[in-house]
């Protein structure tokens, strides 16, 4: 599921779209959408059926990767999205998991896993979600396979779902450190109890894909 290595560029200097280093987890959705449109899928999908017809070829070409449960995270039962992301976003999930596990170990805590609650959406699924979620805008970064949601109040100890204030604190510290490195853009969505995260792609990666 994971690529061998993450791009070694300085994301704050070499990002494909403008980004500043900050420890605040409150990036505007419009900025996340800008990064998604530049770094993600060049064409989004109108319907879930359209996506299913195209997904095998996109995976074969390494444009998309299927995201599956691993030692770093669990994947929720996705009702309004598909478990696929661009390789750079999958790499980011791995790096987040590695950093989270390292910080948990340093504090003598259990090896908690975080929970991914949303990934790639089609226009159809985004429209359906908008009926229930006020945060679901018509044109979403989720449609470009660059963006995922992670629950901030649910963590897994083995296969046991828990709320752990200590795990939440360590995970938040992990996110702050990685946001300061400009690895992603992030917004805490209180209505959905999740972190809305968009991967930052560097210019070098985009040039290689052209």
Question: What would you call each of these model-derived segments?
Answer:
Residues 92-107, 135, 153, 174-181:
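Structured segments of extracytoplasmic/periplasmic soluble domains
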Residues 67-70, 117-121, 153, 189, ...:
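Active-site-proximal beta-strand/loop segments in catalytic clefts of secreted hydrolases
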Residues 130-137:
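Alpha-helical scaffolding within the catalytic cores
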């Amino acid at each position: 599921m994971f690529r061998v290595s993450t791009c070694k560029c300085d994301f704050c200097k070499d990002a494909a779209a403008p980004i500043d280093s900050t420890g605040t987890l409150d990036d505007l959705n419009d900025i996340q959408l800008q990064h998604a449109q530049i770094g993600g899928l060049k064409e989004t999908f109108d319907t879930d059926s359209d996506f299913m017809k195209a997904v095998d070829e996109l995976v074969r070409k390494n444009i998309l990767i299927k995201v599956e449960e691993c030692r770093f995270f669990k994947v929720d039962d996705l009702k309004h999205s598909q478990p696929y992301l661009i390789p750079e976003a999958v790499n980011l999930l791995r790096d987040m998991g590695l950093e989270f596990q390292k910080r948990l170990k340093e504090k003598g805590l259990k090896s908690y896993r975080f929970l991914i609650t949303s990934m790639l959406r089609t226009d159809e699924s985004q429209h359906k979600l908008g009926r229930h979620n006020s945060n679901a805008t018509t044109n979403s970064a989720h449609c470009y396979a660059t963006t995922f949601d992670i629950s901030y109040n649910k963590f897994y100890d083995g296969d046991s779902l828990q709320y752990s204030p200590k795990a939440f604190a360590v995970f938040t510290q992990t996110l702050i450190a990685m946001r300061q490195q400009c690895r992603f853009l992030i917004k805490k969505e209180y209505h959905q109890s999740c972190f809305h995260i968009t991967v930052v792609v560097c210019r070098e990666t985009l040039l290689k894909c052209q």
